[in-house]
Amino acid sequence: MENLDALVSQALEAVQQSEDVNALEQLRVQYLGKKGELTALMQTLGKLSAEERPQAGALINTAKNQVQDALNARKSVLEQALLAEKLASERIDVTLPGRGQTSGGLHPVTRTLERVEQFFTHIGYSVAEGPEVEDDYHNFEALNIPGHHPARAMHDTFYFNANMLLRTHTSPVQVRTMESQQPPIRIVCPGRVYRCDSDITHSPMFHQVEGLLVDEGISFADLKGTIEEFLRVFFEKPLGVRFRPSFFPFTEPSAEVDMQCVMCSGKGCRVCKQTGWLEVMGCGMVHPNVLRMSGIDPEKYSGFAFGMGVERLAMLRYGVNDLRLFFDNDLRFLAQFR
């Protein structure tokens, strides 16, 4: 035990002179490890008498604790110095210009949907929604679409089974509304619809807004005035509008609505194929069979319905010539609509 004090002094001096954490670890192993110098002294206790052994063991443990405390203290000092050096080297240069933040914006389809809804809610319509996974009855049968109609073909409709499908229009929402309430009914039905079609002007998923008004004494003149006013407000300028006779199973009479080309003001251009007119929606008076199947008396009530593609309206309003741009998630395109 004669050299215990000298060994402790040597260890403490080495600890204080160490310059990094790795050196401290080597000193810990040298003095306190399994084969360390202070640990080795514990093995000499067996050579001492029973009376000397407790006192000698206590001295060795005190020495080990003293060295361990010195190691811990020095390690803390070195770690603080290392942290300070790291912070100094990584400090932020506040004189550099900031990166800034890019503000987002509404998608052009969302903007168009909101614009359509805003017009119709201002004139007394309410917004109605329904399921996108629809049954055959509400999507076809209740709308007077017979079993042999081409729209029911597999190449036009996404079927889950013989009775369930992805809705091909938002008209089922109109049927469900008429089934659940009696006239007067004034609703617009925005939402996603699905068809087996994909090209420059068609997408397998797109958005529609359909409208329905059912009440006593409703005529085609009411439909005509509503659509003309909507197009004037939506495009923010007076436009020529014409109604061409057409056929839809759920309306009679039916019409396609054309408006004066917004690109050339009706003079003829590539967009309107030199006709001066653009097709924008379909419409008509609700077929008596549709009213009857929904539980509404067609002898007492009449109504009109219309439907338009939201992407089609957005393309015309913003001058976009490819429908697929709306779904490509290209920020260079979308950033134009902030």
UniProtKB/Swiss-Prot annotation:
GO cellular component: cytoplasm
Catalytic activity: tRNA(Phe) + L-phenylalanine + ATP = L-phenylalanyl-tRNA(Phe) + AMP + diphosphate + H(+)
PROSITE patterns, per the entry: AA_TRNA_LIGASE_II (PS50862)
Broadest EC class assigned to this enzyme: ligase
Entry binding sites for Mg(2+): E252
Cofactor note: Binds 2 magnesium ions per tetramer.
Pfam families: Phe_tRNA-synt_N, tRNA-synt_2d
Compartment list: Cytoplasm
GO BP annotations, alphabetical order: phenylalanyl-tRNA aminoacylation
InterPro entries in the cross-refs: aa-tRNA-synth_II, aa-tRNA-synth_II/BPL/LPL, Phe-tRNA-synth_IIc_asu, Phe-tRNA_ligase_II_N, Phe_tRNA_ligase_alpha1_bac, Phenylalanyl-tRNA_Synthase, tRNA-bd_arm
EC number: 6.1.1.20
GO MF annotations, alphabetized: ATP binding; magnesium ion binding; phenylalanine-tRNA ligase activity; tRNA binding
Cofactor: Mg(2+)
Keywords: Aminoacyl-tRNA synthetase, ATP-binding, Cytoplasm, Ligase, Magnesium, Metal-binding, Nucleotide-binding, Protein biosynthesis
SUPFAM superfamilies recorded: Class II aaRS and biotin synthetases, tRNA-binding arm
Family according to the record: Belongs to the class-II aminoacyl-tRNA synthetase family. Phe-tRNA synthetase alpha subunit type 1 subfamily.
NCBIfam families: pheS
Assembly description: Tetramer of two alpha and two beta subunits.
Entry protein name: Phenylalanine--tRNA ligase alpha subunit
Source species of the chain: Ectopseudomonas mendocina (strain ymp)
GN (gene name): pheS
